[in-house]
């Protein structure tokens, strides 16, 4: 199996999005939070009541204000992914209000075999200093626009937002292997987009 980074690893890409891009899209995502929350979701997660809970029922890359950033192609162009010809990307927005948190977790259970995925996040907006806690670097200051890539077994968390200003980030699960065989058709069409290097085009199926 081809792996993107070490499954326990952690890398940072500086200025994946510009400060101006982040300042432009963050308020639009906050504006549309209620629309994302209205999407039917039968799943149970630790994030009920937040847009993070909705990660499996839509793809934020199809949002009208996110699409022009061409994030799928930017991901495919990363040095870490240059050896790959195609990717399947699941993407969502995290909007943490006062008291909200993202508990400690990994994106694959340590006892499960490797899936060939990497978990990514880009911090967009928040008041004051905000941090993500990674298993290797510990308490790590979030820099607007920086992309963090962690392996599927790398433990990380975001502690409670102590400000009244929402904390906003984009998150991506990048898959090397087509997830279609392991999920329903409905879930597949809502949750993932497919980007191919040969055409520089993505298959986008849903809109928010």
Residue ranges of predicted features:
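Catalytic core of non-heme Fe(II) oxygenases with the double-stranded beta-helix
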Residues: 82-189
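Non-heme Fe(II)/2-oxoglutarate
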Residues: 1-85, 188-208
């Amino acid at each position: 199996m081809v792996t993107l980074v070490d499954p326990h690893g952690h890398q940072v890409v500086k200025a994946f999005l510009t400060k101006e891009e982040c300042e432009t899209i963050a308020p639009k995502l906050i504006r549309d939070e209620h629309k994302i929350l209205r999407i039917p979701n039968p799943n149970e997660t630790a994030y009920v009541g937040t847009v993070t809970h909705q990660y499996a029922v839509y793809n934020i890359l199809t949002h009208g204000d996110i699409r022009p950033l061409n994030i799928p192609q930017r991901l495919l162009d990363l040095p870490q992914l240059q050896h790959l010809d195609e990717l399947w990307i699941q993407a969502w927005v995290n909007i943490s209000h006062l008291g909200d948190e993202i508990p400690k977790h990994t994106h694959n259970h340590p006892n499960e075999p490797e899936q060939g995925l990497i978990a990514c996040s880009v911090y967009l907006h928040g008041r004051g200093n905000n941090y993500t806690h990674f298993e290797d670097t510990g308490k790590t200051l979030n820099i607007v626009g920086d992309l963090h890539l962690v392996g599927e077994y790398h433990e990380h968390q975001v502690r409670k937002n102590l400000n009244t200003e929402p904390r906003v980030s984009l998150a991506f699960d990048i898959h090397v292997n087509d997830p279609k065989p392991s999920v329903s058709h409905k879930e597949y069409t809502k949750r993932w987009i497919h980007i191919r290097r040969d055409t520089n085009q993505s298959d986008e199926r849903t809109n928010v």
